[in-house]
């Protein structure tokens, strides 16, 4: 299973790289679950990341404003991100979600066909009025995305597993694979929960808090030793 670790600056990115993370995912935690960082931070982290190691960028917990979101996606792409992650926070229906993601895919693939577009929904969508998480694979498929992902919108200590059973997560993974896409799961995931994700066939696991001091995504800092421990579990 591939490990995605989400640094907020270059110093944390070096820790994630030295710890062995497969994907370096540029994020800005104060702006939310998939908070967007600045273009220059993405660029700096891309330059600091060894060739062959992929860089991802979250572009925000986005509203239903396809034009705005598409411009943000384009900005992340030209700043050097290989993966473009879109948090479908303000889309209230399947159609709105597809509308956003289809336009994002068009913009990103215009820059590079090899760029990877991630449609991210939320396991706790019921708390924010978002799209049902089990609809996300269809959204990703119909918008031409490469990856369907789930995270948690509200960071209050509850994990992915507090909002969805392992059976529902397995259903999400299987449907994503049926459509020929990769599946990514995140959401305050603890190191001891990772084997369950491996068991259901998850392709990519995303973490920040688990790789930070005190397990704190906001106040903590990513440490390479913690990343190494997570890598070991992912690769076992």
Swiss-Prot record:
Catalytic reaction equation(s): 2 D-glyceraldehyde 3-phosphate = 4-(hydroxymethyl)-2-furancarboxaldehyde phosphate + phosphate + 2 H2O
An annotated Gene Ontology molecular function: carbon-carbon lyase activity
Family designation: Belongs to the MfnB family.
HAMAP family for this protein: MfnB
Residues at the active site: 27 (schiff-base intermediate with substrate), 85 (proton acceptor)
Keywords, alphabetical: Lyase, Schiff base
Metabolic or biological pathway: Cofactor biosynthesis; methanofuran biosynthesis
EC number in record: 4.2.3.153
Source taxonomy: Archaea, Methanobacteriati, Methanobacteriota, Methanomada group, Methanococci
Source domain of life: Archaea
Pfam families given in the database record: 4HFCP_synth
Enzyme class of the recorded protein, top EC level: lyase
Function description: Catalyzes the formation of 4-(hydroxymethyl)-2-furancarboxaldehyde phosphate (4-HFC-P) from two molecules of glyceraldehyde-3-P (GA-3-P).
GO BP annotations listed: methanofuran biosynthetic process
Protein name, per record: (5-formylfuran-3-yl)methyl phosphate synthase
Classification via InterPro entries: 4HFCP_synth, 4HFCP_synth_arc, RibuloseP-bd_barrel
